[in-house]
Every structure is written in C-alpha cells, then in structure tokens.
C-alpha cells in the first residue's frame, strides 16, 4: 500500500470487526486511513431520468438483435410465452433490487446485497458473475459495431473500429459521470426513436402481416403457434432474456445518485415498464415483416429486414447502418459504465487489486477500472476475431454474459429473501409490493432460465467458460484476497456493523 493508504493498527479498532465468518469461513479485514476512501470517491451526478436512461440504454440493443434467434428455437408462440415468463422474472427482480438499492445504496450493487446476506464468499461470487456479464458484453457488441462500420468503410480494418469505439466511450466515461449519463440519455432516446419509427412504419405501410408472424412450418406434433411444441418455450427462454438483460446494472449507480432512496426505485420501475413495452412491440411487429418469422429468426440484423420492408430495398445503406448503430452504441456506452463500477467496488473492498479502484482527482470517476475493463474487452474482441465470431469461443463468450447474469439474478433474489428473514428491522425506505413471494417466484424462474441456458448444446462451452473463470476467482479469493479485505468499504462496513450488533444481542 502507498504510505497514505496505510492500514490503521488493529489495536485502534474494535476487535469484533477484524474478522468475519459464515459461509465463507474466516476472513481478515484491514483498517485503512481516511485517505484511502478519499482517493476512491465518486461524485453524485444523477437524477432519476438519467438513471432511467442508463438502465434502458444498457438493454436496448437487445431490441435490435439477438432476441430473434428465439423464433428459430421456439417459433413465435414459443418466444412470446418465453418472453412473458422472463418478463415476470425481471419484474420480480426489479422490485426486489429496488428495495435493496434504497436500503443498501452502495456502488457494489448485487455484490453488496449478497455480501450483506450471505457473507464475503457469495458476495464475491456474485460480483464475479457481474464482471463476466459486463466485461464480456461490450466486447461482443463492439464486434457488431465494427461489422456495421465496415459496410460503410470497407477499407478500414475491423480492429481500428474496436480500438476507436473503446477509446471514445471509455474516454467519455472517464471524463465525468454527468457527461457519461447525459450522453447515455441522448443515445438511448435516439435508439428509442429508431424503434418507434419502425413500429409506426410497419403498421402504417402495411408491411406487417399476422400471416408472416406464423409462417414457420410446424414440426410433427407442433402447431402454427408452437411449431416446435412446448419444448420450444423452454428453448426460447435465453433469447427472451435479451429484451431485458442489464437493467439490473442500475444499483451500481447508487453512490452517484443525488437521492438513491427515491430515485433508484423510480428509475428501475419506469425502466422495466419501458422495456416491457418495447419488447412486445419489437417481438410482434419485427416478426411479421419481410420474410416473416422464418427469415427474421435466422437474421443477424432483424431490424434491417424491418426497415427494408417499409422503405424498400433502395433504402440507403448509410441510413440503415446509423439506425442499427444507435442501439448498439447505447448499450456499449452504458455497460462500460457498469463494468467500471463493479471493478471499482470489488477493488475498493480488497477483493481484487486495490489500485484498480483509485478515482481521478478532479472528476472522481473510476478511470483505472474503466481502462482495465476496456483492455480486457479489447483482448476478447481480438480473441473472437482470431478464432472466428461463429467459432466455439465466440459463441461461448456470448453465452458467458447471459449465464453470468442469470447466476447473479438467482443469488440476488435469494439474498433478498435471506435479508427479509435475518434482518427484518433493517431500514427499508422503499418496499417491494411483491415482497418475499415475488422474490421466490423470481428465483424459481431464474433457475429455470439457468437450466434452459445449460440445456442448449451450443451453449455448453460458455457454461464451462463461466464455471472455469468462477473457480479461478474463488481460488484467488481463498488463497489471497480474503485476507486483504477493507473494513471501511461501504459494502463491507454495513455488513460488519450488523454482525457486531448481532453478536452483542446474543450476549
């Protein structure tokens, strides 16, 4: 540690806060001086509208691509039912984390909630699952961005676009949280405008047809609504997740919210309402244009099919490319914000190297965490390119982001249930109207979605990749970082204080 971050001698601290036990076994905490946290300070910059845009922007690329492969897996009916099931899971989760983010407004988000419920080990596991989701996803998205850019500038190598987009958007994130969130608002509104233009155009032009929605030939035992039978619903679940994946990143902005107690629940709830509406319009209208569900379900650019069916094949390549890029850029930009905060919070608490969490002196943004995540993302982009985007590794990385997300969903809702039982008197400025029953339903649906992700054979490499990374990080935790945790990190401090008070009550 640098001299201004020296640990405070244990004798000057309460003895009861030096160690922690539970599902994790013994952990050891170091007590740091005030300068440590001062060098890791975030700036409050967000009201609920900017938070809403952060959440919706992170997800909105899922309305542009990815979801449509569920048509090939389950047909329109299978994907529709799967999307509704997944929507119930997300609503249950959003209400649960709205309550937790108001009660525990820390930058750690899911890691903080699970750490307070089950201790450092499972808290760290949830944090690592978030790292997988938020670091891998931008790498996959930037490859799609570069592919679109190459249609306009074929002479420019793909890697130039990867580097350029990472430099631009990591740079924006590093220049200030308020700038980051305002840019996020602009690109999110642009992406929503593109979708709304498509919705109106599909209906007004007559391009949409219900016959096209149900044009996938049914297999034996299937129907026009469920061409692949009831199993098609199960197989389509991972693709329904694309419509909502990453709304859960919002609690990571708690320490940068002007009033997390009121703004965070409001932004989360309005965010999921917005995404529910967009998902249904996209699913129905985009499935019924062009060559219908049969063509859209196999396309890498389903929205492009939609716009061509409205405006004709002569629609300019530039217009279609810009339209597609808005959604991709919105998610790329906002998920960079997310990985920066996950790495920052885990580093500040000592789970990963502490130097990563130092913030910039003037803007108080986690610039080191942003750069580290960006370098890893770029490395993954080069890896995917070298081995082929359709290769086992490329597909595995896509699956890892979804698999990591679903693991974190199950853990956070189980944490909600545990905290409701073990800490009933914890101040909860906002309470989920669904309460524990909602969290139970959400947990069950998350586990079903986890099973669906594992059941698809092509997803197995991603499942293995996630498991390997989790095991490596857990070994790192037990061998090294569990002895280096920081007692004054907000996520740890609240849990340690509760543990100390519980110990006093027992005596």
Predicted regions mapped to residue ranges:
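Membrane-interface loop-to-helix entry segments
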Residues: 146, 158-217, 245, 268-273, ...
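Extracellular loop-to-transmembrane helix junctions
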Residues: 64-161, 271-277, 281, 408, ...
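Membrane-interface "cap" regions at the ends of multi-pass membrane proteins
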Residues: 1-78, 90-91, 95, 107, ...
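Helix-loop-helix junctions that connect adjacent transmembrane segments
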Residues: 37, 79-80, 154-157, 186-321
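C-terminal membrane-solvent junction of multi-pass transporters and transport-like membrane proteins
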Residues: 41, 183, 356-364, 406-458
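TM-loop-TM module centered on a large, flexible mid-protein loop between adjacent transmembrane helices
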Residues: 112-113, 119, 151, 155, ...
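A generic transmembrane alpha-helix motif of multi-pass inner-membrane proteins
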Residues: 85, 395, 399-400, 404-405, ...
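Membrane-helix boundary/coupling elements in multi-pass transport proteins
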Residues: 106, 129-143, 244, 248-257, ...
